[in-house]
């Protein structure tokens, strides 16, 4: 469905406190400071951002060790370029990225889009640590991510807004959680029989959906102000039900609560496989829970979505924005 004409008003909206009962608490990787500095310098060396975007980017904080930081930075490079690209350009960029990841030893052209070299260097470093299973799953997940980014560009070029069910199908890949989870299992040897177990698959999908909701709640103001909110669940819900942004936020907050309860209930059903594998399974599942908290903390503590008011807004939950109601 294409967006209809809109009327603009200024309003204060309340961000739902979606993680009020989430048991995983905020914590920082002990190697974070050193990894963040090295990874930020690496990313800046590609000159992939405009000066204004680079200044904003440098204010952001990233969770995890060096490989995790590099992946987040690679996501930012991809977002910076594909968010304004046509479907055709996004496909070309996606192909460059995947060629670099599938064959990182192949020299990249100096005239090639910068994302190729960034992906190559990231993956060459990551493969030094990745187990074979994590290596394979990351490549598969990143292909799905890039394909979905191309689909997002196609939707944007047509001013097309999906319904809720169709949106989740695409967003589960554009959110970038699947390749991120593959990095979480970088040192783990989890066979397909584990990852394809119904409980593990359900926990993974529930976690992704919870992250989508948290991300879309926090990113909506910035995306809306830049006229790029078509790929956001708030817009999707507003468009489908003809309701206000606050009503849409409340709707998806209720959905978030239901999904979070399902995740915690499903957690009780984590299977046992025997021996050391059980510890690796628990490590992966705790990584899912931690990722939800990390995404929320980063959304407020970085300056990407709320500028210098992030911590204040995390407490008050109040944001002022210029609302365009698609009714």
Swiss-Prot record:
Enzyme's top EC category: lyase
- EC number(s): the record gives 4.2.3.135
| Extent of motif DDXXD motif | 79-83
Task: Select a single GO molecular function from the record's annotations and give it.
Answer: metal ion binding
UniProt cross-references to InterPro entries, sorted A to Z: Isoprenoid_synthase_dom_sf, Terpene_cyclase-like_2
A GO BP entry: isoprenoid biosynthetic process
Could you say which cofactors this protein requires?
Answer: Mg(2+)
Query: Which residues does the annotation list for site: Plays a critical role in the stabilization of intermediate cation?
Result: 76
Q: Where does Mg(2+) 2 bind?
A: 79
Q: What family, per the record? A: Belongs to the terpene synthase family.
What does this protein do, in the record's words?
A: Terpene cyclase that catalyzes the cyclization of farnesyl diphosphate (FPP) to delta(6)-protoilludene.
- Protein's name in the database: Delta(6)-protoilludene synthase HYPSUDRAFT_138665
